[in-house]
C-alpha cells in the first residue's frame, strides 16, 4: 500500500534501506537495477524485511544498454516533426534516447528484455517507466531551466515522425500528417501515436502476465495530460496497478494538483487497474498533506519518490503512524479506501486559493526585485481580465495599483486539470 522508487547499484547498503522502509511502514519497492542478476541479489534482502519488489524498467527510452543500441541500430530512434532523429539529436537532455514504437524489431527487443527480468525468481512484478514519446510539453516549472515556453506544441519537441510511423498512419488514414499546416491539431494523428505506445504497453502486459507477475507502470499524472504531453494514453493499458507520477512541485506547486489529478484518474483509468498516487518526498508536514489529498480523492495507495527524501526522525515516526492508521481504516472498510471528496477537478484557477497565493507571491517578488528591496511589498490588485485563449493556454492581465505594475498571468490546462501557471511583468 505504501511504495517507493529506488535506484539499486551493486555495493550499496540495500539492507539498511529496506530496514528504514520496514520501520516507517512501507511495503513495496520499484527497484531499478542494471541487470537481472542484480535483482537476484537484492530480492532476498528485501524479502527479509517484508518488502515486495517490482523491477522498475525503462522501455521506450533506453537506459543501461543505450550506447550499444545507438551503435548497432541508429535507425530505431524516434524522429521529430523537423525530421531530426534522436540517434544524432538531443531533446532536452543527453539521456533522452527514445525508440520508435511502430517498429516490430523495437517491440521484439523490448519484449525479450522484459522476459529476462520476469525470469528472476522472487520478483513480484514489472513497473514500466518511460513508456512514451519525448515530452512535447514539459511540466511548467522546468521551462526556465531550458529557457523555453511551451504554450503550444512546437515541432522541435514533437516526436513520433519516424518513417515507419508515418507509413503506418498513412496506410490506415490515407494521408501524411506533415502535409497539414499544423499537424499538432490533428486528433487522429495524436491518438495514433498514443495507440502505438499503448500497443507496446499491452504487449509487455501479456509477457508479464504469462509469468504470473503483476503489471504496473509509472506514467504522467493523468491519461489526458499524458496523452497531450507525451502520447501516453495509459487509461487503455492493461495494468494491475498504476503509480501515476503526480509530482505537484513540477506543475502548479500546490497540493490541490494531487486532488484534481486523482479525481480524474479514478474516472479515466482502466476499470481493472488499482490506482495509487506517486508523489515527491517532502521531509516535512506537506508530505502528509499530499498523501491526504491522494487518499481522500480515491487513490488506494501511495508511492514516494523516494524514501531517501524522508530524512528526519520526526517525519519518519509520523510516517509510520500515518501508514498504520491508513491500513486500519482500509481494513475496517473491507479492503478499500473510500474517497471523501465527491467533486470533479476544478478548472477555475481563481478558486484555487493555494495557487493564487503562489501567483501573488511571485508578483510581490517581481515588484521587490524591480525596486531593489528584499522585503516583499503588499499588492492592491485590480480585476483580472482575460486577453487571450488558445490550445491549452489562458492569458490574463491584472494591474497592481500600489506599484503601478501590470502583470501578465498565464494558466495552462493540459488535460482536464490546471497543470501550470506563469507570471511576468509587462
PLM segments and residue spans:
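Substrate-binding cleft/loops of secretory-pathway carbohydrate-active enzymes
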Residues: 136, 214-252
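Substrate-binding cleft of secreted/luminal carbohydrate-active enzymes
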Residues: 244-255, 271-336
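Aromatic- and acidic-residue-enriched segments that line the glycan-binding/catalytic groove
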Residues: 62-90, 131-178
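The substrate-binding groove and active-site-proximal loops of carbohydrate-active enzymes
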Residues: 5, 26-33, 92-108, 186-196, ...
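Active-site-adjacent "subsite" loops/lids of carbohydrate-active enzymes
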Residues: 54-118
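Aromatic-lined carbohydrate-recognition surfaces of secreted/lumenal glycan-active proteins
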Residues: 127, 173, 188-228, 273-283
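Boundary/entry segment of secreted carbohydrate-active catalytic domains
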Residues: 1-15, 219
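Catalytic domains of carbohydrate-active enzymes, especially glycoside hydrolases
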Residues: 11-38, 120-121, 239-241, 297, ...
